């Protein structure tokens, strides 16, 4: 397993290697105001969209077909269409099956970070080497403008209280992942008029935590979301 062959973490790898995402995680524990997971058509290719949800078994069949058709796949990831850790059974079963069948492949997950921490030991055992955490704010007053609600256990939490819980858990997750030798990338979506002047603060906080890569992503207008009126950043 060559960890340098992850195209999302190494720009040079983009020229030679590809990745495949397995859509085994339909549920999400957060409602982001920029997100609408219901939209799906042949012309829609944004992250978080899939034409079907696969069971772990179906994902393995699909993966075999992908490997048979493409000889340059170095990474198998789980990124949704919901959050992997709002679907922990499906996520971990799929990762375990992939690791057993393809011991040399790079495994990664992308998450909002709300429920990662209880599963870090299992991720390390399965040799999941890369985790991406989306952190859009490190100030709950700003986070409250980005998230409608989050589900914490059986409770739905909103506004600054919810944003504060999310931030605390994201920071805890990043620290735990780094302590286990897992590479961490932090994604931040630049939302005009919401957090665009806050991104530098987020970047500094991520650097303090030892994040390996910080990735700024310009907002893409998403029909049906609460932020559908926002324009793309300049």
Predicted regions and their residues:
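Short glycine-enriched, charge-decorated loop/helix-capping segments at active-site entrances
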Residues: 46-51, 147-150, 159-160, 228-232
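Active-site mouth loops of central-metabolism enzymes
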Residues: 25, 48-56, 191-196
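N-terminal [4Fe-4S]-dependent radical SAM core
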Residues: 1-23, 37-51, 65, 69-72
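Conserved AdoMet/S-adenosylmethionine-binding subsite of the radical SAM
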Residues: 85-217, 222
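Short cysteine clusters
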Residues: 28, 32-35
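Conserved beta-strand segments that form the floor/walls of ligand-binding pockets within enzyme
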Residues: 23, 77, 185, 189
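Short Fe-S-cluster ligation motifs
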Residues: 57-79
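Auxiliary Fe-S-binding modules of radical SAM enzymes
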Residues: 1-16, 196, 200-234
